[in-house]
């Protein structure tokens, strides 16, 4: 049986589906053809392909790639910051090498002496320039010496011949003949540019035309002023084309309100920064002054200590202290000879670590009775020679009457520790009549009455009250 004549078992629904699919394909073909004719290309068809085993990635590859990208970004940021820091340091170093310091006090913070480096660099440049000039002069002399004495032969090409000419400024020039036309053209252009000035350009306009231009400019400014909202009138609004120069202290603010406020804020911020820097500078100066004064005070203390050890304490105090001096014992006079009988001298040694003029008391000497003499001080010659105009005010000595009384006394030792059998007790403990006499000699200055002490404790308590 022939296959072509064999009937096909096809249902009606399948035939309808086939016709519908055929019709849809025909319509798609017609649409594509129309789009091609009109010049519009349709979207390419997307083909859904199954991913192959080669396109499949390993687990965690994308995460590692993201981490690497983040790490590269962080490294790039760190590198950019380091580059910015290095550029800032390079600019700062370049400024310092040129001598442009931010502040004079900042110069002391650095270990490098940039001022000396600038001086050395200039000296080196001057030396190298002088050496180079001397070398050039030597080479020029050598070339002149090596030139032949004969005449220089003329050039083979006449265009290479040297010619002299005078430019528009009256200067004598020398060039090759082939370059002469170009140089003359340049000179002509330069001469024309020099003689055309802004003043000459203004003269090209008549007075009426200039007034008309000014009127038009004024009208434009008035229109802009009408468009702006009502507000305060500033100097820049009425200045117009003023030719007066207002100096470096004048700042031209903008006419726009927002821009003007921004400029004023910036100017205020700069003023505050300047004030803060000035205050910091003053504080630094005060700290340095305080440190210097503390050092000087330490040096004075050391000097006083050395002078006390060397026995020149009184001279240093007279030179340093201003005002009323505390009572201090002066040079001990020679003891007067006792008329009644021989007496034992009691020498009191002063410790260097105690107050001057007050002897040190040992623990086993407290409460003992000694026949010490009395203090008698006389007025210092320096104070006597002093001009009353330069003396301290009298109010300083209101509560120091006893001090002045005791300052005119000197220490003497008239009595022994124990009296002789033939001597009266009042003579051994009391002063002699010649010492207690309040009537001074006609030639000697008046002396104050004496003060006697029975015990060492009485004497110390008295001098504590006095000093």
UniProtKB/Swiss-Prot annotation:
Residues 324-336, 439-448 have a biased composition (Pro residues). Residues 40-77, 124-162, 299-363, 378-453 are annotated as: Disordered. Residues 425-437 have a biased composition (Polar residues). Widely expressed. Keywords: Coiled coil, Nucleus, Phosphoprotein. Residues 64-77, 124-139, 348-363, 378-389 have a biased composition (Basic and acidic residues). Residues 63-99, 267-309 form a coiled coil. The modification Phosphoserine is found at residue 197. Disulfide bonds: none annotated. GO terms for cellular component: nucleoplasm; nucleus. It is found in: Nucleus. It comes from the Eukaryota. Probably involved in neuronal development. It is linked to Hypotonia, infantile, with psychomotor retardation: An autosomal recessive disorder characterized by congenital axial hypotonia, weakness of the abducens nerve, psychomotor developmental delay with brain ventriculomegaly, variable thinning of corpus callosum and cardiac septal defects. PANTHER family: COILED-COIL DOMAIN-CONTAINING PROTEIN 174 (PTHR15885:SF1). This is Coiled-coil domain-containing protein 174. The lineage of its organism: Eukaryota, Metazoa, Chordata, Craniata, Vertebrata.
